[in-house]
Every structure is written in C-alpha cells, then in structure tokens.
Amino acid sequence: MPQSGPRRDPIRARPETGLTGALTGPYPARVLVPDLPLRTARLVLRAFTTDDLAVVRDYRGRPEVTRFLYHQPYDDAAARAAIDRLVRRTALRAPGDVLNLAVTLADTGEFVGDVLLTWTSAEHRQGEIGYVAHPDHTGHGYVTEAARELLRLGFDGLDLHRIVGRLDARNVASARVLERLGMRREAHLRENEFVKGEWTDEAVYALLAREWRAAA
C-alpha cells in the first residue's frame, strides 16, 4: 500500500474496531487460539515479543513503508506503544480481536514483516487480512506465503465465510499480493477516507471460503 518504495508494499490495516462481547445467535461460537509458532515452506509465523522493539522501530519508522498506512513513521514512543499491543495479539476469542504475527525466515530467523487477521463479525463470519512487509526483504513472495497461512487459519480454523483486504487504491504492489492469493477486487471507493491530510481512494478485495477451498 509507492512504486519507489518497497516492491511489496504494506496493505493498509484498519483502525481498531472496538468490538467486544460474548457470542450469541445462530452461528458457531468458535475461537481461534493457534499453536504458535506456525511454519510454512520458508517462513516461521510467531508471536511478537518485547525483543522485537528495535526491528519494529526500524521498518515501521520508514516513510516508504508507512506511506499508505494510517499511521506516521514510528518514533521510539510509537514503537513501544505498538509492541505493547502486538505482544497481546495471539488469538481470536471475540469479534474485534486481532491476530498479529511476526514473520521470520525459517533458515536464518531474519524478520521479514508481519501479518494480521482481524475477526470483524461472528454473526456474518467475516474477517479482514492485512500485512506489512520489511522493505529489505521484498520481492521474494514472503508476504504472499505468510498471508496465505492466515487465510487458512481464518477459513479452516475460525470457519469464516468471507475474508476481505482493504488498501489504498494507489498501492498497486499490494493489490497484486491480494490477487495472487486469489482475492477478487470488489470495489473502488472514491475519496472515502481523509488520511494524512488528503482524500484517498480505497480498493476492496474479498475471498469466500468455498473459493478458497476450490483453489486448494
């Protein structure tokens, strides 16, 4: 979420929804507490720890990374506040919860970014995926590989019906990641948000559980 920045730019994560509460109604009362760390062919997806403060300060402090995100580049205080949130985001127990995992290389342990899955609705079984790539490790498909694992968790672990991805419409590189995940572009919303002093367009992508399983 500029072509002059990372080759695989971050998708724009939404602000906190503030949704909480017990599940009631005619839908599954499921929770997702993954057995961390998760492993893919090349990556390890693990919980954040306070030891990640320096790397979070580094990559989230770069203007090219945050250009299409809601927040400004992190300073020391913002990085500390972020770590306080990130270390707690290890499970989805209620709507509004966020699962946010650090992504590292399995062979070397190098940090390559983070991915997140937000449980947006239990009643409608919906979620939202997001990611932020470390600009020193773009162009290798790491974000796509990690995000695919979170789609699997959302559909197979939490039994979601639909997962969306939202991004600044100027972020062509991030749109390509979503397309590689099999997500379809459903909307282009004109000047629907005022972010960092300007009206911005938003693109919306989505994938249904049956589409995910058919492509598996």
Language-model features: locations:
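GNAT-family acyltransferases
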Residues: P2-D136, L153, G157, E191, ...
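Conserved phosphate-binding and hydrolysis motifs of nucleotide-dependent enzymes
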Residues: T49, G113, N171, R180-G182
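Conserved GNAT acetyl-CoA-binding A-motif
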Residues: G157-R166
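Short histidine
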Residues: L167, S174, E186, E198-D201
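Conserved acetyl-CoA-binding loop of GNAT-fold acetyltransferases
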Residues: E179-L189
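Conserved acetyl-CoA-binding loop-helix of GNAT-fold acetyltransferases
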Residues: Y131-A133, G139-D156, V172-R180
